[in-house]
């Protein structure tokens, strides 16, 4: 029997000669960026390439990237990416896998303010809300839910494709595989144009759709239709966050991936060829980065960039690439998060009696006189939420604006306040239609995640881009072309069932 056990592998190798010609796995992979994209990339790369590969995550600041918290009087509050949609399956999987807890949604009444008055105010009675919506907007709200659901249904095909190990070498191919020409149209026209063509009223677009764009992306209805639809999904019910802060997902994924975190700012990447005696030359990437002890570097088989490229973001020089890696026009939009512990000046919003004001979330229409995009009562990351209660006279309010609020503006919004914390972000792309995407494959084994943000920026989009990049890197390394850029995948997978 021992002899037979030794013979079996030899017989299998003879029957499957291709097994012997499989390329060895990479020995070292670098991920640039420790936000949700980079941490998810490390997690998925470990899954695909196995235990033997060395994984380095290069992060210039704290893990979490644009997922961050601010401390206000001893409690921490979400200051960056705050909410997760119930259909965000990667984020749901991460939270379950890492044993994290879900913070319940904060339930407070909302209103839409146009700079002079509230054009819509929620009631605590759902029946009254239904009548109000019908009176103001007819069937537009119901039709919008169906319109967004149709787009999300197509987009959710990505989970099946990725579950079956399929990857895409460009963002355009990925999106076309999900939604065909419908998605291409949504990327090439504004949300205003897309919804007008779909028969939505201008009043509804101005008073409901535009405020959703402003709270989620700090921009109006000139953003492309695709990101607009994602933004509308971001104001639906069932949104949640991670207890203790969404950034816990990032540190948890990196720990789970057994990746080594190297604190440093990447300054350049250069292709290198190492010649081995009697063997084929080995192609590597030399990554140079700044640390607290000076300039240093290392070489890697594969590099995944999970930080937005650009002079104000990840300002990386690509040296001696042939052809050269071009600069991508990649402007990001500035959003200022201001957390204020204080009493809202309700008279600014037309309520002379503070006792009569019951709103805990205020969205705004597009009015050049308005210096805020939205404001709302928030709970600490470790709290159980407001549970639908009315805001307390003194609460912590989160204000989104495009510019830092002046003292005069704060005094207009609040009758009194104890503390103010400010966090400026280059939070998401400055969107414009038609949208152009940077490539995913920058060089043979050099990949770029953040281009998918130009379709829509969200935690889940970063996780999807991360899994796609990990699958793509794996298939390209091992020459599995049948798993890359397959046409009509939706139909193919249906017939496999």
What does each model-found stretch correspond to?
Residues 474-497:
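Active-site-proximal substrate-binding core of FAD-dependent oxidoreductases
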Residues 96-97, 101-220:
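Mobile amphipathic helical/loop "lid" adjacent to a hydrophobic cofactor/ligand pocket
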Residues 300-302, 307-482:
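C-terminal segments that line or cap access tunnels to active or ligand-binding sites in enzymes
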């Amino acid at each position: 029997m021992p002899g037979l056990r030794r013979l079996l592998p030899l017989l299998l190798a003879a029957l499957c000669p291709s097994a012997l010609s499989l390329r060895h796995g990479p020995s070292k992979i670098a991920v640039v960026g420790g936000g949700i994209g980079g941490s998810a990339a490390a997690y998925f790369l470990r899954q695909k390439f196995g235990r033997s590969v060395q994984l380095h995550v290069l992060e210039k600041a704290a893990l979490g990237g644009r997922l961050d918290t601010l401390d206000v009087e001893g409690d921490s509050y979400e200051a960056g990416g705050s909410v997760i949609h119930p259909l965000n399956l990667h984020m749901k999987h991460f939270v379950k896998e890492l044993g994290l807890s879900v913070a319940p949604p904060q339930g407070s009444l909302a209103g839409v303010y146009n700079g002079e008055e509230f054009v819509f105010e929620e009631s605590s009675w759902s029946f009254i809300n239904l009548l109000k919506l019908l009176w103001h907007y007819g069937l537009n709200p119901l039709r919008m839910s169906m319109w967004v659901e149709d787009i999300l249904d197509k987009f959710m095909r990505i989970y099946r494709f990725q579950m079956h190990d399929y990857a895409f070498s460009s963002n355009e191919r990925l999106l076309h595989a999900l939604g065909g020409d419908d998605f291409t149209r949504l990327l090439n026209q504004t949300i205003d144009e897309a919804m007008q063509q779909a028969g939505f009223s201008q009043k509804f677009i101005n008073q409901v759709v535009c405020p959703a764009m402003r709270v989620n992306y700090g921009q109006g209805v000139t953003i492309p239709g695709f990101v607009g639809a994602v933004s509308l999904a971001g104001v639906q019910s069932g949104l949640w966050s991670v207890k203790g802060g969404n950034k816990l997902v990032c540190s948890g994924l990196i720990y789970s991936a057994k990746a080594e975190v190297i604190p440093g700012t990447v300054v350049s990447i250069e292709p290198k060829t190492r010649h081995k005696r009697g063997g084929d030359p080995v192609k590597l990437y030399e990554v140079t980065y700044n640390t607290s002890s000076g300039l240093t570097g290392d070489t890697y088989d594969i590099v995944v960039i999970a930080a937005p490229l650009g002079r104000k973001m990840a300002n990386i020089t690509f040296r001696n690439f042939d052809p050269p890696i071009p600069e991508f026009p990649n402007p990001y939009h500035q959003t200022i998060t201001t957390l204020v512990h204080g009493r809202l000046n309700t008279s600014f919003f037309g309520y002379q009696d503070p006792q009569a004001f019951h709103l805990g979330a205020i969205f705004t229409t597009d009015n050049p006189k308005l210096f805020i995009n939205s404001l709302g009562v928030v709970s600490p990351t470790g709290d159980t939420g407001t549970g639908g209660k009315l805001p307390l006279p003194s609460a912590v309010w989160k204000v989104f604006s495009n510019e830092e609020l002046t003292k005069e503006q704060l005094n207009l919004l609040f009758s009194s306040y104890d503390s103010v914390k400010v966090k400026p972000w280059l939070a998401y792309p400055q969107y414009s239609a038609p949208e152009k995407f940077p490539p995913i494959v920058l060089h043979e084994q050099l990949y770029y995640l953040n281009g998918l943000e130009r379709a829509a920026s969200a935690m889940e989009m970063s996780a999807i881009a991360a899994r796609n990049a990990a699958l793509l890197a794996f298939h390209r390394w091992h020459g599995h072309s049948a798993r890359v850029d397959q046409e009509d995948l939706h139909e193919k997978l249906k017939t496999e069932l």
